[in-house]
């Protein structure tokens, strides 16, 4: 019974992630979904800035603290290791859904590209960014990243085994193509409002800080293998002179 509950929990967490990820595209792009970065709850500008920063902070703290090895060691004293990743994914998704629900509109326009070719180019970059995010997850192990492999192994009664480090496709050009895709998607917009700008700056700043912690953990886990990889491949921008 426990094995079935484990895989049901992992699948449910993944479904919540899919909802949060799909909504993120509409939220940032201001398309399809009812509440977006440009059309959310009306509020005075001061209140909007504070609330939006708190929402970004909640996601940042959850996402970074729960990803650290020290927290994982403590957390798995209470949560079975097989669902640790699924729980992380679930809580990160809930933090995003909270952000979508409580975001405050900041409607002042920073830029508005009216030239058709410019709009098409920016929309193309927007979709390219999201496509990069999604496809990059499969270039490592999508199912491991979102906890499905862990719960599947538990369901089968098999021990968990680490997946070795390999740099495939985009990972041969940048160390963090998922984060690169997010940054491109957050900034590529024909119309940048103050709210969207706050979101883009906050999210990009968080990514740059969080990557420092991620790199430290990877160095600790992989040692010289990752140290050599860092020397050969840029973190976010695919500089050709570093690629070998």
Swiss-Prot record:
GO terms for molecular function: methyltransferase activity. GO terms for cellular component: membrane. It catalyses: methanethiol + S-adenosyl-L-methionine = dimethyl sulfide + S-adenosyl-L-homocysteine + H(+). It is a multi-pass membrane protein. The chain crosses the membrane at residues 7-27, 41-61, 90-110, 120-140, 181-201. One of its GO terms (biological process) is methylation. Its main location: membrane. Keywords: Membrane, Methyltransferase, S-adenosyl-L-methionine, Transferase, Transmembrane, Transmembrane helix. It comes from the Bacteria. It is found in: Membrane. Gene3D superfamilies: 1.20.120.1630. It is an enzyme of class 2 (transferase). Its EC number is 2.1.1.334. Belongs to the nurim family. Catalyzes the methylation of methanethiol (MeSH) to yield dimethylsulphide (DMS). This is Methanethiol S-methyltransferase.
